[in-house]
Amino acid sequence: MLQERIADVSKFVEPDRVRREVYTDGQIFELEMQRIHETVWIYCGHESQIPKAGDYYTLQIGRQPMLMVRGKDRKVHVLYNRCPHRGNMMCGDRHGNTGEQFRCSYHAWQFHHDGTLKNIPMMESGYAGTRVNKGSPELNMKPAARVESYRGFVFASLAPTGPTLKEFLGKSIVAFDDMCDRAPGGEVEVVPNCFRVIQHSNWKLFMENQI
């Protein structure tokens, strides 16, 4: 069993070496997704990537498909990229504009930009005798537990509790300030066709090679 085999993860790391399972074992990877990536603050994107209402940008937080969207109220929302009805993916493209609302391609459920349910087609006849209650919050697109933006950089955490974004960033916040303060008007933006790399490796190998 996973919990029995890696109850003490420190055994995999020695003063002069790291066991290969840390980089190759799928169960350890799943535990890392659960305890690290789906718990801490994760960078989602920059506000300049979604300038207009309905603009969205899709991403991944740990194992969870997410999307960042600009609402009509100009607020930035980070939602799970799936319909609460049957789990169908809401937005398949990397980025785009969803128009007045999100619309699921499976059963045409519609949602506001903040993820709240807007309309269920044929609610009166098609869902008779079921437990579907249009007023239930469970029928809304699920939002990330916490969302914060620092100087246009949007972060989200799937954990409802934990350090604030500024506490999490710590001294690295100076790098954000330095980059923005050098830009005209103290703001930066992500321009179209930004350079993107997909690294087919364990995430730790990539991170260690950047240090």
PLM feature segments, named:
Residues 55-105:
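Glycine-rich active-site/cofactor-binding loop and its immediate structural neighborhood
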Residues 82, 108, 123:
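Short, flexible active-site-adjacent loop segments at beta-strand->alpha-helix junctions, enriched
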Residues 99, 109, 121:
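Active-site HxH/HxHxD metal-binding segment of metal-dependent hydrolases
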Residues 1-75, 112-211:
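Rieske [2Fe-2S] iron-sulfur-binding subdomain
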Residues 104-106, 111-113:
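Extended, hydrophobic alpha-helical segments in both membrane/secreted and soluble proteins
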